[in-house]
């Protein structure tokens, strides 16, 4: 975004989770922490009673593990919901799971080529043709946002989430998942 300082810093950290990107404003541990602080400051102005939940911590601590396993278990059904909403090119490479490269920390957008429910893993192939097996549990992957949204609702027992009219179709889609 043009309204964020230190553009070179951001460019160097493309494809990383925001909690792995240094804060371009230089006042928090990460860009994710900066954005979370901004959100909490805004909510605090109105006196809302809320429990802030860090997505990164929830993925890494295992809080989302059971629900991630349900996504793995229902992978085909989820794909049946998502794929019709995507263009042809994106359908060819889409996966609800986004592995995090153990060497670079980059969030990879690669298709899943195999799944092992018993082991709780999926396999993907990188651009060089190498295959890698990734654990669903423990923070080795994330989910694409519409599936992530549905997963959070289930994992965190969310009954209602506000959204603007620009997200109505996404709410419906995530509700199907």
Which stretches of residues belong to each language-model region?
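N-terminal Rossmann-like or analogous alpha/beta NTP/dinucleotide-binding catalytic cores
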Residues: 1-79, 174-176
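Alpha-helical recognition segments enriched in aromatics with Gly/Pro capping
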Residues: 74-77, 84-177
């Amino acid at each position: 975004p043009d309204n964020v300082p230190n553009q070179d810093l951001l460019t160097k950290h493309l494809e990383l989770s925001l909690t792995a990107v240094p804060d371009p404003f230089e006042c928090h541990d990460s860009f994710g922490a900066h954005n979370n602080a901004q959100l909490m400051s805004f909510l605090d102005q109105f006196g809302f009673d809320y429990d802030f939940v860090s997505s990164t911590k929830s993925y890494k601590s295992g809080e989302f593990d059971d629900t991630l396993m349900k996504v793995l278990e229902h992978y085909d059904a989820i794909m049946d919901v998502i794929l019709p909403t995507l263009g042809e090119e994106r359908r060819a490479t889409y996966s609800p799971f986004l592995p995090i490269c153990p060497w670079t920390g980059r969030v990879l957008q690669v298709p899943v080529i195999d799944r092992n429910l018993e082991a709780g893993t999926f396999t993907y192939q990188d651009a060089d043709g190498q295959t890698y097996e990734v654990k669903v549990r423990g923070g080795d992957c994330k989910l694409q946002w519409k599936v992530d949204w549905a997963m959070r609702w289930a994992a965190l027992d969310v009954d209602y989430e506000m959204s603007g009219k620009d997200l109505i179709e996404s709410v419906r889609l995530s509700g199907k998942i």
